């Protein structure tokens, strides 16, 4: 399913042994209002079939994505070998610790260093900082550009971690805009992983994330983004939309 939202895939065999496959937007919690003359473009679906087992099915599917859906210079070329600092450091790092990890990895033939969670805002553990997409210069002294330049000078590419849809209640973003989160009226929110989910139905939320991420990505020679999503959607209710349009959110 060429779509990142809630979807349904079904396969059934009827009484005369006909097999039917159906895939599309999941009907649960979905509705979409169309005024006269408006059009709704449903997401595309890619299906793969093989009579030669799962291996052939998987190979056919991979080829379809590489040849027709992937874009950019890595569409058909080998991806760089990368190292990620997450389990080596968790949130406890500074630019020197990151540089040393990259330096040792370079000696082993690794081609890219990816800086994971903890580089932004007041992010000392998983209870704070999400949503504040600006560099923590107590950890990355001199800013992101200086660190990336050092990594590049070793002959390595640089990547960075984001989790754009999530926000911590202990963050500058949440304190400024508590109404930007999905939340069901008069109910306590689900704080899975100490996170809430931003309401992407709001244009101001999308604009904030776009501008904040662009500012980071434009500040240095960043060639890769690890785009994480660590919790499921819940409390799917937008204060921005009226009651009869809540089915457009999920």
Regions found by a protein language model. Give the residues of each.
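Catalytic cores of glycan-processing enzymes that make or break glycosidic bonds
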Residues: 1, 17, 29-30, 34, ...
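Active-site neighborhood of glycoside hydrolase catalytic domains
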Residues: 136-154, 174-250
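Aromatic- and glycine-enriched glycan-recognition loops and surfaces
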Residues: 89-175, 182, 207-211
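Short, solvent-exposed beta-strand-terminating loops
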Residues: 2-4, 168-170, 176, 228
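Flexible hinge/switch segments at interdomain interfaces of large molecular machines
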Residues: 72-77, 121-122, 182-189
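Long, charged amphipathic helices and adjacent flexible linkers at domain junctions
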Residues: 61-81
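Hydrophobic faces of well-ordered beta-strands that scaffold small-molecule active sites
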Residues: 42, 79-85, 111-115, 158-162, ...
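N-terminal accessory beta-strand-rich subdomains and adjacent acidic, glycine-rich linkers
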Residues: 1-65
